[in-house]
From Swiss-Prot:
Its main location: nucleus. Part of the MTV complex that associates with the HipHop-HOAP complex to form the terminin telomere-capping complex involved in telomere maintenance and prevention of telomere fusion. As part of the MTV complex binds single stranded DNA in a sequence-independent manner, protecting it from degradation. It comes from the Eukaryota. Changing F89A: Unable to protect telomeres from fusion events. Probably homomultimerizes. Component of the MTV complex, composed of moi/modigliani, tea and ver/verrocchio. Interacts with moi/modigliani and tea (via C-terminus); the interactions are direct and require fully intact moi/modigliani and ver/verrocchio. The MTV complex is recruited to telomeres by the HipHop-HOAP complex, consisting of HipHop, cav/HOAP and Su(var)205/HP1 to form the terminin telomere-capping complex. Interacts with cav/HOAP; the interaction is direct. Interacts with Su(var)205/HP1; the interaction is indirect and probably requires cav/HOAP or moi/modigliani. This is Protein verrocchio. Keywords: Chromosome, Nucleus, Telomere. The lineage of its organism: Eukaryota, Metazoa, Ecdysozoa, Arthropoda, Hexapoda. InterPro entries: NA-bd_OB-fold (IPR012340). The gene is ver. GO terms for molecular function: telomeric DNA binding. One of its GO terms (biological process) is telomere maintenance.
Amino acid sequence: MDFNQSFEDIESQLDNFVIRKNQQSEKSTGKCGPEVHDNVPLTISQIERATQDPENENVFITDDVHPIHFCTCIIYAFVTGNGTHNESFMKFMIDDGTGSLEASITKKPFNGRVISSLYSEASSLASSEAYKSIAVSMMRLLQVSMEYIDPTRISRGHSLFLRGRPNRFRGKMGLDAFQFFIDSGRSRNMEIGFVDYLTDWQRRHKTMQNTTNK
């Protein structure tokens, strides 16, 4: 660490790390057979039509001309209503214009308690001039962290990024989400950006499949 940096500089770097933390590899190649991908951008209609790989229960296959084998996916959708919540999950009905399904989002209560405890400690330090600057910065970072782990903040009308995997229960396809991000912006920039990313990713996959099959 550069000791000439201000607390604001350090906070900016930490905030940047939280937002741009390394994600899992986008794809992994098995010993044989098709490539199995992680974090694939998909539409809800693709998830609804996906089937489980009979040779690997952790892998799903899209029902496309150029099928995608994947373990985890990313979607962007609008919250249209609540499902039936339980002790472990918050459940929401989501729609992206191509289809709708129920998404289950893990509550992660332990992480929430840890962050709340740290926030209380930082808040008590903020009353001291010696620690006020770094304590206030830490409080802001902890507040941002809660936005990524507390699904109770989600409500009807929110737009979400969700990372998870399909789950078929009683004949209906749903999504088990491990991570979420609430798009609180008033513009549609993030939605449009996701559509562009999805289109580009699937175009590259199609090109790769055509090249492989030649």
